[in-house]
From Swiss-Prot:
GO terms for cellular component: endoplasmic reticulum; endoplasmic reticulum membrane. This is Very-long-chain (3R)-3-hydroxyacyl-CoA dehydratase. It catalyses: a very-long-chain (3R)-3-hydroxyacyl-CoA = a very-long-chain (2E)-enoyl-CoA + H2O; (3R)-hydroxyhexadecanoyl-CoA = (2E)-hexadecenoyl-CoA + H2O. The keyword Membrane applies. Its EC number is 4.2.1.134.
């Protein structure tokens, strides 16, 4: 099982590294012109990596990994909502600069997280990488939440005008579903989810440094 986990995390690391390298290279060569077609150049690989991340929930449910299910579920779900429900469904949003910024933040976090998880799967620890894994989220995660919120904000006019995912039913009962209201509710609840996930990540960080301090004393 350790071999399987290390291979899974290696695949994720390679995928996100390719995305990060592609985005960085395109920006260095084309400057701001690269922002507009970020989704068209790396969107398919990004979608593949996010679909693959469902396995991380299965790992927890099957007892392969001991991480908390709810924090992981919320992190996977928020990316699915933003990537597949919001960005993929609205072509006008795909060319926004905020999408490039969001993908950059996501992948800058993942190229740190996945090699750490890969090494942890085979009981290997590099202190610098471990410290970075338990510290970088303090900056990266709140920034990603802000970028996600702004992406939703930018998408609302398009969902409003195009009526994507909204519908009305006359029979057998009168029923109306207005999707922009759901996105607005999501924006209201998003800070609650962010605080919960940050508290879980902070607890992990605290436990790591406490263990490290005990080892030094011994």
């Amino acid at each position: 099982m350790k071999t399987y986990l290390s291979i899974y995390y290696l695949i994720q690391f390679c995928g996100h590294s390719w995305i990060f390298t592609n985005m960085t290279t395109r920006f260095l060569f084309f400057g701001q012109d690269a922002f507009a077609d970020t989704f068209y150049s790396i969107g398919l690989v990004m979608q593949g990596c996010q679909l693959l991340s469902i396995l991380e929930l299965a790992h927890i449910l099957l007892g392969v990994e001991q991480n908390g299910f709810l924090p992981m579920f919320l992190q996977v779900a928020e990316r699915f909502i933003i990537l597949f429900v919001v960005i993929t469904s609205q072509e006008e949003v795909q060319s926004k600069y905020i999408v490039c910024a969001l993908f950059f933040i996501w992948n800058l976090w993942d190229v740190i997280r996945y090699p750490y998880d890969m090494l942890a799967a085979v009981d290997t620890d590099y202190s610098a990488l471990t410290w970075l894994r338990h510290t970088w989220w303090i900056v990266a995660y709140p920034l990603s939440v802000l970028a996600e919120a702004y992406t939703i904000y930018e998408s609302l006019p398009y969902f409003e005008s195009l009526g994507t995912y909204s519908f009305k039913m006359a029979l057998p009962v009168s029923l109306s579903f207005h999707f922009p209201y759901i996105l607005t509710l999501y924006l209201v609840l998003q800070p609650v989810g962010m605080l919960y996930i940050c508290s879980c990540l902070w607890s992990e960080r605290k436990q790591y440094f406490q263990r490290k301090l005990k080892l030094k004393k011994n």
